[in-house]
Amino acid sequence: NLDIGETNEELVVELDAPGVKREDIEITLGDNTLRIKGKRESQKEERGKSFYRSEREYGEFDRRIGLPCEVDANRIDAALKDGVLTVKLAKSAKAKEQERKIEIHT
């Protein structure tokens, strides 16, 4: 699951990543696309243990997110806390200049 938010200064991407280790995530930016890929390892099987129900997803994931504006590639911050990966991307000066309020006429 993924949310993308926006302020005047930055874009904020939040991705649910429960059980995923920081070292198992790779984040890249290219062609105005943010790519987040990684893997969630399955728990070690215990001898004699079987599941009544198993709904957790394991394995590799690869998300590509087209960004709605240009960002400054040198001002990106990522943090993994409580199973949520948060990536903050500062908008480029050009993107901020293009943003303007449009008046509505009657």
State where each predicted segment sits.
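Alpha-crystallin/small heat shock protein
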Residues: 1-106
